[in-house]
Amino acid sequence: MNKVRVRFAPSPTGSLHIGGARTALFNWLFARHHNGTFVLRIDDTDTERSTEASYKEILAAMGWLGLDWDEGPEKGGQFGPYLQSQRLELYRREAARLLNEGKAYLCYCTVEELAERRRQAQAEGRPPMYDRRCRYLTPADRTRLEQEGRQPVIRLAVPETGTTVVKDLIRGDVAFENATIDDFIIFKSNGMPTYNFATVIDDHLMQISHIIRAEEHLSNTPKQILVYQALAYELPAFAHVPMILAPDRSKLSKRHGATSVEEYRDEGYLPEAIINYLALLGWSPEGEEEIIPLEKIIEQFSLERVSKNAAIYDTKKLTWINGHYLREGNLDRITRLALPFLQAKGLLPDPLPEKDYNYVRSVIAAVRDRVKTLAEVADAASYFFTDVTNYEEKGIRKHFTRPGAAALLDEARERLATLPEFNAQAAEEAYRSLAEGKGISTGQLFHPTRLAISGRTMGPGLFEIMELLGRETVLARLDRAARWIRENLA
């Protein structure tokens, strides 16, 4: 294979959608697998919808995911600039060449005229295509129309017969009859190129070898091939990756939950989990595993293992994968990532005093096995940082309503108060001794204690919680719970 050069070319008209992130990832993986070049280009010719905020957000999302680009904004490269809005002269030059060679023409039809002709064609049962009337204008016709003050667009003169074949590396050959393709606009009357024109020129000048993009772009590809041919450019390879659908097989949208990378980041998902999950949307690894290190994905990635069939987006699986990376990730890194979520809930000061870091780290080590996102860390860990003022209702019914529950907590409190050393092992030994002496099961003692000191019925090991909270806090919470039982359940 010749030198691989691929690109991801988002439009800065919104956040980086999860589908766009998957396309970027597949391009990045293909480049890394082949020791090629991954180019980031910003297709910002839609001046009405493109914003600086979206541009910055896309770059931030790409950086957060770890999809580093070799050429592009903030990196530069020999084929820049990498924003289409800074390349307009290149497009104008090539459009002028097509006009001079008779491969494109000026069209003076107004929006109103085109709309009326479309309505008429539909009423007569004809395809609502442009009727090519400006294709054969005489110089005198053009002069007259320009004198009327009409601002022309430029249309490509599409062959009226024959077939344009997309040789797709995933879908095989896909044929389009030229008779069904409009003489489409390549330059708008406002002096801006259309997507199907500008992208061809950029991909050619940037020496892109493979265009890997979403299936919804397949219908644009014959038009782009016609532009390649008109400009006498060599064709790149095309690969259209499958659509991503919601579980009900509808188009993925906000009603199915988060759809942008930024939203997932803010909900506490880890970039490595999103990368792992997105890689599996349409691509199959060599084995059956679902947790795959990035190095292994790069090593195995190929377009031959990309499916033609739509991928079903399963948030539950993403969340499960995220839970794995939370449990297995470097504890200091997970702690740093969790801090903003704890601070946003008012559980920790911002900035965190350095003296408190080890305690927070230990708490996260205790709770991370039972959470799936960083946002869940804040909820799971809250009682380590704030007083327990409420108890779970099901826990109250099951554990606090037992006869003698308050007295049992009092006895447990006294045992803990007299321990020479207060740690998990000593607390557990004291509790087991107390349960044995009273002839009750350990659960009858452990469960009400957990509820008393955490407000929860589930969580980390009871004695791990005790050691982290410390003797003073544990005793105070046992006192409060016993008092609450007497005041509310007596």
From Swiss-Prot:
Gene Ontology CC: cytosol
GO molecular function: ATP binding; glutamate-tRNA ligase activity; tRNA binding; zinc ion binding
UniProt catalytic activity: tRNA(Glu) + L-glutamate + ATP = L-glutamyl-tRNA(Glu) + AMP + diphosphate
Residue positions of motif 'KMSKS' region: 251-255
PROSITE patterns: AA_TRNA_LIGASE_I
UniProt binding sites for ATP: K254
Keyword Secreted: no
Keywords: Aminoacyl-tRNA synthetase, ATP-binding, Cytoplasm, Ligase, Nucleotide-binding, Protein biosynthesis
HAMAP family tied to this protein: Glu_tRNA_synth_type1 (MF_00022)
Protein name: Glutamate--tRNA ligase
Origin organism lineage: Bacteria, Bacillati, Bacillota, Clostridia, Moorellales
Gene name of the encoded protein: gltX
